[in-house]
């Protein structure tokens, strides 16, 4: 029997394996895909958020701020591509300025270091390509960009070298509680373990409902991006956000660690693992991003 089975080897499963590999445990990772970091971890905004957005006092607030600091340490230790470029949340009209103050107060309560509310002039001095409609911005210097696929892979490699077993193409199709732990059904047999870490991403609710009542549901959200040529990579030097809304942090414009420019995403609820791109979605991303940085050459 294993001590711990980790279901899923995206960035969360990889980080769990990396941390647990320091201890004398028998750990196995069960990854449904044929490689690690093959789902959400390989296709996202690649940003380590500063932590001003979560509500103060929540677990998310505490872990966000602690996590961005830990990620910096891990990337340095494992030689993972990382750049602490900081982020700017823009107010594109006077009505959005109070929201910057709200985020600043959130971040202060959460312990986000070095934040500052910038004037219009200070904002444009930092990013001359921004829209002339900018009224101010929230500056968060601890935000960073990373290669998330490389990050997850590096942590997994260390975990495996330290004795963690990695099983790829090993989808968990059922689970049951047994005396002293759980029995997981996988291709070709079963795995017995004392503990389970559910890091199954958008399928985590289905894994949960194998052994517990289905008391929550994950609704996957598809995001569409433009990844632009390196000729656009210096268009901005920081992660550029608009004021967040109910669907999330909105369409961003950001450099990548490889020198490209990343623009997006939108947020469309979908069924299952729908990763298609649509002309309407990309047009929305383009139009929305140009509110922040009108000169982007799409």
Language model feature labels by segment:
Residues 2-29:
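N-terminal Rossmann-like FAD-binding beta1-loop-alpha1 element of flavoenzymes
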Residues 21-43:
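Glycine-rich FAD pyrophosphate-binding loop
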Residues 138-195:
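Helical element adjacent to the flavin cofactor pocket in flavoenzyme catalytic cores
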């Amino acid at each position: 029997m294993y001590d711990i089975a980790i279901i899923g080897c995206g960035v969360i499963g990889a980080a769990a394996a990396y941390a647990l590999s320091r201890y004398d445990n028998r750990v196995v990772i069960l990854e449904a895909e044929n490689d690690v970091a093959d789902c959400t971890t390989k296709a996202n905004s690649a940003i380590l958020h500063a932590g001003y957005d979560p509500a103060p006092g929540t677990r998310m607030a505490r872990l966000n701020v602690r996590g961005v600091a830990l990620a910096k340490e891990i990337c340095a230790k494992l030689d993972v591509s990382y750049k602490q470029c900081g982020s700017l949340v823009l107010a594109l009209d006077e009505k959005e300025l109070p929201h910057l103050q709200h985020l600043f107060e959130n971040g202060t309560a959460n312990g986000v270091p070095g934040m500052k509310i910038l004037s219009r002039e200070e904002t444009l001095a930092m990013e001359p390509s921004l829209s002339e409609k900018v009224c101010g911005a929230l500056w968060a210097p601890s935000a960073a960009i990373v290669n998330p696929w490389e990050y997850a892979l590096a942590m997994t490699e260390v975990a495996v070298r330290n004795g963690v077993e990695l099983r790829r193409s090993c989808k968990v199709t059922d689970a049951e509680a047994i005396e002293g732990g759980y029995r997981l059904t996988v291709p070709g047999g079963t795995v017995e373990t004392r503990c389970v870490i559910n890091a199954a991403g958008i399928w985590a609710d289905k894994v949960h409902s194998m052994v517990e009542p289905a008391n929550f549901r994950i609704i996957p959200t598809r995001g569409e991006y433009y990844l632009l040529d390196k000729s656009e990579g210096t268009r901005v030097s920081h992660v550029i956000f608009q004021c967040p809304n109910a669907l999330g942090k909105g369409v961003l414009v950001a450099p990548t660690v490889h020198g490209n420019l990343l623009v997006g995403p939108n947020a469309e609820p979908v069924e299952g693992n729908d990763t298609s791109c649509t002309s309407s979605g990309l047009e929305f991303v383009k139009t929305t991003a140009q509110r922040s940085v009108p000169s982007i050459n799409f």
